Amino acid sequence: MHLSQIVLYLGLLIALGPVVLSDQETHQQPSATSPEDTEQCATCEVRQQIKTMRLNAIKSQILSKLRMKEAPNISRDIVKQLLPKAPPLQQLLDQYDVLGDDNKDVVMEEDDEHATTETIMMMATEPESVVQADGEPKCCLFSFTQKFQANRIVRAQLWVHLRPADEATTVFLQISRLMPVTDGNRHIRIRSLKIDVNAGVSSWQSIDVKQVLTVWLRQPETNWGIEINAFDSRGNDLAVTSAEPGEDGLQPFMEVKISEGPRRVRRDSGLDCDENSPESRCCRYPLTVDFEDFGWDWIIAPKRYKANYCSGECEYMHLQKYPHTHLVNKANPRGTAGPCCTPTKMSPINMLYFNRKEQIIYGKIPSMVVDRCGCS
């Protein structure tokens, strides 16, 4: 090789060397995000989208299952005023304190569309003027909806709070049905109880009113309300029928238990993961719903619960079993041609809440907890 050719060859190497070296460095330099990191990041993004859509869906489902067009406009202050300080309600709240939001071994309802009510607590309102004389009595009228009438009554209890007596005495608690003033005798006594009370002690008393409630449901036109009196030996009326200062939550209310439909028990099973799990298959992930974050003060309990959600890959084609499947499709459009990871088993939650009429309802909201995920 001539010297001139060698010089030319070396010149080409020198000229091309930095380019080639630079190109090699470009390929060999570690990337800021490896393929594994990129895939993991994309998976996290999909999960976050699914969680957001699941929360929005839960809002809509609760209102739909409770047959509400929108959430009741009941603030936290109103809740404090309306919430009875009574034994049956306190027992329910104590249950939530003990159980927390544990969803194990829950009971599933056959009705997957609407809430099955167990207990209704109705606050008393002022009777119509036709049964009042000089604006009295101020209490008590209980209203019933068509939905309520369609259910079978198991038990109906009227709860009345008695103010403390000045001395140990016998109190005669009387419950009378009201009639229009024009009908002459506007009081029909239906129940009378004799109660011994101690001095300086207030108490809640319950009276069975199932019979009169049954009459009201069969003949709504006869429901003009009731009058409640609890006279001691001195003629003082100790019954709290309208809230005096410091007596919020002590007004009379009716606790009605109605029959439930058939139900069955389903056990929880399936593949469970946490947010840091590397699992790529269809799996159930934790998701906590916080009603206070929604601004839903009208829900008394639970304040939060574990709803869970499904995410992951599927390999086989199946038919969709639940409407929640479309949430995954929206979050991952590229996967819509194949099977989706979706809830295959769901269970209800027990909820204590105010409806739009400011009645306290305790019931089951079906299909609110994801128990198991699968491909469909």
UniProtKB/Swiss-Prot annotation:
GO cellular component terms given for this protein: extracellular region; extracellular space
Signal peptide: 1-22
Subcellular location: Secreted
Pfam families: TGF_beta, TGFb_propeptide
Family of the protein in this entry: Belongs to the TGF-beta family.
Known role: Acts specifically as a negative regulator of skeletal muscle growth.
Protein name per Swiss-Prot or TrEMBL: Growth/differentiation factor 8
Gene (name only): gdf-8
